[in-house]
Regions:
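Basic helix-extension-helix modules of the SAP/HeH family
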Residues: 2-77
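Phosphate-binding loop and its immediate beta->loop->alpha context
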Residues: 77-202, 275-392, 396, 406, ...
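Acidic low-complexity intrinsically disordered segments
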Residues: 90, 94-234, 619-624, 645-650, ...
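Conserved phosphate-binding catalytic cores of ATP/NTP-utilizing and phosphoryl-transfer enzymes
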Residues: 214-238, 421-454, 725-743
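Gly/Thr-rich phosphate-binding beta-strand-loop-beta motif of the actin/hexokinase/Hsp70
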Residues: 231-264, 333-336, 342-343, 438-482, ...
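Flexible phosphate/Mg2+-sensing switch loops adjacent to catalytic phosphate-binding sites
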Residues: 259-298, 447, 474-487, 710-715
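Helical "lid/coupling" subdomains associated with nucleotide-phosphate turnover
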Residues: 370, 498-503, 507, 546-744
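Hydrophobic, small-residue-rich alpha-helical packing segments that form membrane-like cores
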Residues: 381-388, 398, 404, 408-448
């Protein structure tokens, strides 16, 4: 069975010569237009495709004939009867042993875990020389590449199935890999071999294993190379705690591995530096979206649906694999892709419709998708560290600590979740600082320090304050930490910055394609850069972007991106517009990273190669240009790169008002009441905080004061380090508690709520029940007639703008008799006796209050009949939900 895959090179910053011939895969070519196929024929000098008039299908076949690359068919997922079918082939169809003459060299020793996968990260390299002289007369040539490999005994008995995997480099290295689903069965022999096959024979084994239709094969020729030693182990359960920072855009994980975390650590991994004992170990993930396939400590929080034909066994792809799937067709297929699943914390029991590429549709609970993603992270950690974790520590936003704790316990019930000592993300970052202060002995004993933490993540930005004290009591360090959530913006994060850049890009391209001219940003934002902060103070952020937003709406008529508006158009038009949004959002994100991950970039443009790059002009490399432009009412693809250049000064001007508005919203209260100077540490975390505008905005409130922000060069390593501060702090915290060096006392104060909750009286008077940014007024009540069936409550932001309306349904049949003592035991501090004593017979009082441990508010109704009090059902309403939160991927942008 022949098959094909696509290997895109989007975002690869490595400069390559364009002179070498590229190979193409059928799946990639099928996504291209006829114009693009002709361009390939010209670029690759495929004469038949240039001189002959060929249709699209003929062009694809011609390119595949001369530059085609078939995919590797790996045996990885277990299939009933597959192992036995391969055994049968070895017995019946094994042909001649080919001479390798030392061109294939196995690793000295294999350590295989029966209950774990083997990955290229294990670095079991098979060295392959594709042409080598035998020292006498003729050249020995093997044609080995990515393929299936069999582990056999000396009498050719099948013992296991492995994969030979390339690292993706131009001069590739090959590593052994193995699925955890396919067993290794050791025979009673001393000597074992790896049996290698060239592509044709390897594909035949694949087809046999999965019982697919295959061409008859007379014999299977093979290379047989001895193994010096192989050892089979079973991964042990460990007491080490796996810490996970489940992020909106990216997730990280790691553990502190001491010398006794398992009885027999993997010697091979320690030699290679993959496991470091008595140290923090971070889980690395293979970035399969890039040609060089690096191993990174970040996993994108993205899930795609691979196959939902069987609703009981839905197959998903996670992280980089999901991103790779989404890039293959730029979203003109109808399979489900989920971003920002962390936002589902308040609705994780809701049902979610999913669809795969073949059009199969089913529904699953949202918690299933979150669970599968987290299990993938855990499984990867177990594979990296060669153990089985039973104890997990998961950080969460400080304001949603209880909600996340509840969700994690429910969906990961087979693990022990450290909820009693669960750190929030801000405190984890601060503990990273505390641990470093203790290690370097730079703290003042028994003296309190105060810190402000601004965390600008992928989807949200939060402000929390933290006061801590370190005391050395001669037995251990006593660390007292008190944390308060101070403010936040659930709709501002790295994605907002990307979207703002996308708006500018779209406007620029719309002018280029419609008028063949560029437009300067100062024509869209007419306020000088030096006056932006003052202008926001006086008129607000929206006034700054008024003309830009209007120009963006006009650009929609030329480069449409609001694909939700095209649901009543043809399928092709819908996907062309959807392609536009994701294409522009993707390249905006790449340009953002280019500007803020590389020092000295002044100008930037998009191009397919680096030919025009110099010290002044940097290239954001895009493999192919796919932008749809509306011309005379028709949507037309454009594949030529536009001659448009962006500069850093314009991008900085573009983002100034957005970033200052958030910083002003967070710090203005502290600045006005004079408490800002009490903070000795101001910590900026999250990858978006690398942007200099954050620090410039902070200086507006902290004149002359040094902001404690670790200065790194703006390279990818330091950007990643910002994200790792949280998971490293969590690992240090759980390890310090485990070994008894530190006694940590955590306290959480009543959070500052950036929302108000109001309701209208029967006289149409609006009253505040919960006041914004007020720790005192966090409870109130409103009275209604006893027969009320529904109470409407209004949520407003700190500026008084309505965000959402809640409806509490008053179920008369659910009231029960109650005494005030019972009420006090349940709601002490929220419902007072004087407020229940004056309830009349025809009145029901709805008590509305927020608590320190839940990010939302409760509604509790109490009524009276004679002297008897009755209490109705308690209901919790979250402040934030996915109904009113901004979703950049909903087709309305």
């Amino acid at each position: 069975m022949a098959g094909y895959t696509l290997n895109l090179n989007i975002g690869d910053n490595k400069k390559r010569s364009e002179s070498y011939s590229k190979t193409y895969q059928k799946r990639e070519l099928e996504e291209m237009t006829t114009v693009q196929l002709h361009d390939i024929c010209t670029r690759e000098r495929i004469i038949k495709g240039i001189t002959n008039t060929l249709n699209r299908h003929e062009l694809i076949e011609t390119i595949l004939r001369f530059r085609g690359e078939k995919e590797t068919l790996f045996i990885y997922e277990r299939e009933e009867g597959g192992y036995e079918r391969v055994e049968d082939i070895i017995k019946r169809k094994l042909g001649s042993q080919l001479r390798d003459e030392g061109t294939i060299r196995n690793p000295a020793k294999l350590i295989v875990y029966s209950n774990l996968a083997m990955s290229p990260n294990d670095r079991y390299q098979v060295e392959i020389d594709h042409q080598k002289r035998d020292g006498v007369s003729k050249a020995v040539v093997n044609h080995l590449g990515e393929s299936n490999v069999l582990l056999i005994s000396e009498d050719n008995e099948l013992c296991g199935i492995f994969n030979l995997v390339s690292d993706g480099a131009e001069n590739p290295k090959y590593y052994l890999a193995k699925s955890d689903e396919i067993p290794v069965i050791m025979a009673e022999h001393r000597h074992y071999y790896l049996m290698f096959f060239e592509k044709k024979e390897s594909d035949y084994l694949y087809s046999a294993y999965y019982d697919l239709e295959r061409m008859p094969a007379a014999v299977l020729n093979y290379y047989k190379v001895p193994l010096v030693e192989i050892e089979i182990r079973e991964a042990e359960e460990t007491d080490a705690i796996l810490s996970i920072d489940f992020g909106t855009s990216n997730t990280t994980a790691g553990a502190y591995l001491d010398y006794g975390y398992i009885s027999k650590p993997n010697e091979h991994d320690m030699l290679n530096g993959c496991i470091k004992l008595d140290d923090i170990n971070l889980v690395t993930f293979n970035d399969t979206t890039r040609d060089d396939r690096p191993w990174l400590p970040l996993l994108p929080t993205v899930v795609s649906v691979a196959d939902c034909s069987n609703p009981e066994k839905v197959k998903y792809k996670f992280g980089y694999d999901a991103q790779k799937e989404t890039k293959i067709k730029y979203y003109d297929e109808t399979f489900s892709v989920f971003y920002e699943i962390k936002r589902w914390a308040n609705s994780y029991n809701a049902m979610q419709e999913i669809i795969d590429k073949k059009g199969n549709v089913t529904t699953v609970p949202r918690y299933t998708i979150i669970k599968k993603y987290l299990e993938y992270v855990i499984k990867t950690a177990e594979q990296r560290f060669k153990c089985k974790f039973k104890i997990l520590h998961l950080t969460s936003p400080v304001k949603l600590k209880q909600q996340y704790s509840k969700m994690f316990k429910e969906i990961l019930s087979e693990y022990v979740i450290e909820t009693d000592h669960m750190l929030d993300e801000g405190t984890a970052v601060v503990y990273n600082t505390i641990a470093n202060l203790i290690e370097k002995k730079r703290y003042y004993d028994s003296e309190y320090m105060q810190a402000l933490i601004i965390d600008c993540g992928g989807g949200t930005t939060d402000l929390s304050s933290c006061s801590f004290m370190i005391r050395n009591n001669s037995v251990a360090y006593d660390v007292n930490i008190e944390t308060t959530y101070e403010n936040g913006d659930t709709n501002f994060g790295g994605n907002n910055i990307t979207y703002r850049i996308m708006q500018y890009i779209k406007i620029m391209f719309a002018n280029y394609y419609s008028k063949h001219e560029s437009i300067r940003l100062d024509e869209l934002i007419r306020i000088p850069a030096a006056d932006i902060f003052r202008y926001v103070d006086e008129y607000g952020k929206d006034k700054v972007y008024e003309q830009l937003e209007a120009a963006y709406e006009e650009a929609e008529e030329i480069i449409p991106t609001k694909f939700k508006n095209y649901e009543n158009h043809t399928r092709d038009e819908y996907f062309m517009v959807k392609n536009n949004f994701y294409f522009l959002f993707d390249i905006a994100d790449k340009m953002k990273k280019q500007f803020y991950m590389n020092e000295g970039i002044i100008r930037n443009r998009f191009q397919s190669n680096y030919d025009d790059e110099n010290e002044d002009l940097k290239i954001t490399r895009i493999d192919r240009w796919n932008l749809v432009v509306k011309e005379k009412g028709r949507l037309i693809y454009h594949h030529d790169f536009p001659d448009v250049i962006f500069n850093i000064k314009e991008v900085e001007l573009l983002l100034q008002a957005d970033i200052y508005e958030v910083v002003n919203k967070f710090l203005n209260r502290f600045f006005k009441d004079g408490t800002l100077n009490n903070y000795s540490i101001i910590k900026l975390t999250g990858q978006s905080c690398r942007i200099d505008i954050f620090r410039e905005a902070l200086k507006e409130f902290i004149p002359g004061k040094c902001i404690e922000f670790k200065q790194h060069s703006n390279d990818s390593a330091s950007i990643i380090e910002l994200k790792l501060a949280c998971v490293k702090g969590a690992i240090q915290y759980v390890n310090a508690r485990k070994i008894g060096f530190t006694d940590v006392n955590l306290n959480y104060s009543m959070p500052m709520i950036p929302y108000s909750v109001t309701a209208f009286t029967h006289e149409n008077e609006e009253i505040q029940l919960i006041c914004s940014l007020d720790k005192v007024v966090t409870a109130g009540y409103i009275s209604r007639n006893k027969d009320i069936r529904q109470l409407e409550l209004i949520l407003k932001d700190g500026y008084g703008k309505e965000k959402f309306r809640y409806n509490y349904r008053n179920e008369v049949g659910q009231y029960r008799p109650v005494t005030y003592k019972e009420i006090e035991s349940m709601y002490k501090g929220y419902i007072y006796q004087e407020d229940t004593d004056n309830i009349t017979d025809r009145e029901v009082k709805f008590f509305v209050f927020a608590t320190a441990d839940q990010w939302g508010f409760y509604v509790v109704p109490i009524t009276r009949t004679g002297t008897q009090l009755y209490i109705g059902k308690e209901e919790f309403f979250a402040f934030e939900n996915d109904i009113w939160e901004v979703d950049f991927f909903d087709g309305t942008k």
